[in-house]
Amino acid sequence: MYMILTGLRDMAIASGMRVLVRADFDVAIHAGEIVDVSRLEAVLPTIAFLLERKAKIRLIAHLGRPGGTRSEELSLAPIGHFLSRALGCPVRFSGDPFQEAQSDADMILFENLRFWPGEEQNDRAFAKALALHGDAYINEAFAVCHRNHASIVSLAGLLPAYAGFNLIREVEALSRVMEHPPRPVVAVFGGVKIETKLPLIRRFLGDADRVIVGGALANTLFALRGDGVGKSITDMGSTDDLSFLNDAKLSLPTDVIVASRLVAGAPSATRAIGEVQEDEYIADIGPKSQERFAEFLNGAKTVLWNGPMGCAEVPDFARGTISMAESIRKLNAFTVVGGGDTVAVLRQNNLLMGFSHVSTGGGAMLEFLSGKELPGIEALRRQ
């Protein structure tokens, strides 16, 4: 899908060279504490590589959606504290890259770029102001490569630009799923948004040997074919052509766990599809579906998974997602899992070990797999 990207190992790094690293620091922070550090850990090998070669690192990133205005709760300051501890060296924090004088510090973390409207507007003047802090640019933020933003696109055209280690890993792993993967290939989709996942379902019905759908995504497909889903979450979106619902490769749950409320401790029951009551929510896939999906996965050589099988943020309804993870982990196959909700559940249950690749991308992963050009990747290719 994509030509080989020019990466760090292709870069001539001189001692004292200032390198702007666009990182992915979009993580949940509560009361100043980082909830999940996995995205931060993903950039550490790139930072360590540069430090070993005496480069001066300038970290740029975003957090949340402040809408072009400053928000104390979306400051990157806590990220700086984590990086300093993880790397064992000082990380200077700058609250304003545009007022920052040139510095000889080994590492500087600039404030949340989305505090300025120029970032999301892909403003070239904004990018030029950032470029003054660097002699070269590295993109280590695959998760936002589908965004046409200044630090992702324009900045890559103003400096010699390279792909970070994790970004290259993402592109290689997802390309491996798309280009001549070992067969049988099984794709598993869950979650909510049908407008982003329906193109993938259709694509993999053509390319894969089996497509398994669960979660709220399956609820929507049940509703589209006329099955009752009670009060369940659906996302009807734009679905003019429903012929894919009859594809023999498409596998939906045959039984589900239902509950009166999607909260811990709520009374629940198992229902066959077609027997869900009007006052019930579909909360998870049922035990027969878990067994059936495990059988479909047996013998697979390539597996792609994005999206939980139910309301997995509630532990009572995470069993289907956990069962899916356990089935995939034991395969002798190339396995890729992605999507923030899915990865979060697997991490909480210590189930990430055994997957060939855990993607940090959400929307970027889906767009890549749909065959769309990602602006951030294209900007690197133009180099």
Segments the model singles out, each with a brief description of its role:
Residues 1-383:
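Active-site loop-to-helix "anion-binding N-cap" substructures in soluble metabolic enzymes
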